[in-house]
Design a protein with these regions (language model features):
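Short glycine/serine/threonine-rich phosphate/pyrophosphate-binding segments
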Residues: 51-57, 130-131
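Short, Lys/Arg- and Gly-enriched loop/turn segments at beta-strand edges
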Residues: 31-40
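Reductase modules of NAD(P)H-dependent flavoproteins
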Residues: 74-191
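Conserved beta-strand elements of the Class I
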Residues: 42-45
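Ferredoxin-reductase
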Residues: 1-20
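Loop/turn positions that initiate beta-strands
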Residues: 20-21, 162
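Generic structural signal for buried aliphatic residues
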Residues: 23-27
Length: 191
């Protein structure tokens, strides 16, 4: 098992202080994953630490599916996993400051490269601002491609009881990201 995290609070700080050989207690698996269905041509749009779950998907299906990955970071010092995405298919990197790849973000690079019928499916994970931009762009440009997003939410219990990770759905109901997600159809959740 590989744990990837970004220092955000006491929990990730404690993980960062663990040493080789230390024992950690984990509760896995939680929620659902990306269901690629019959899709063969897949756009992967990731930002920041959101690239980690996407890398797992491209690793699992490399050779079986055609991936074009658009991944973005704040700057070159935050860039990671690029070789894994390259092994799985085409990779386009962007950074907010232009220190690596294109200057801009992953959604912008996807939109500049998009052609009708190029993809059967879009999968994405990243900060809420990125997912909102993607949802808006898909709607404004009338891009009909199915899009699945994995939400980054703070999770307490991991089993849906504490309600720390609740998100609003477009039907007016709530969803527990740890149990009902973290992967949702982009039109199913408020971002």
């Amino acid at each position: 098992i590989t744990l990837c995290y970004q220092l955000k609070g006491d929990g990730t700080r404690a993980i960062s202080q663990a040493k080789v050989g230390d024992k950690l207690s984990v509760l896995l698996p939680l929620g659902n994953g990306f269901d690629l269905g019959d899709a063969k041509k897949i756009a992967v749009i990731g930002g920041g630490v959101g690239v980690f779950p996407l890398a797992a998907v491209v690793d699992e299906y490399a050779g079986e599916r055609q991936f074009t990955s658009y991944i973005g970071f704040r700057g070159i010092e935050y860039a990671c996993l690029t070789k894994r995405f390259e092994r799985a298919g085409k990779l386009i990197v962007s950074t907010d400051d232009g220190s690596m790849g294109f200057k801009g973000n992953a959604v912008q690079t996807f939109l500049s490269d998009y052609e009708e019928d190029k993809f059967d499916l879009i999968i994405s994970c990243g900060p809420p601002v990125m997912l909102r931009a993607l949802k808006t762009a898909l709607k404004e440009r009338k891009i009909p491609t199915r899009c699945l997003v994995s939400l980054e939410e703070r999770m307490g219990c991991g089993i849906g009881a504490c309600l720390v990770c609740v998100c609003k759905k477009t039907d007016g109901h709530n969803a527990r990201v740890c149990k009902d997600g973290p992967v949702f159809e982009i039109g199913e959740v408020e971002l």
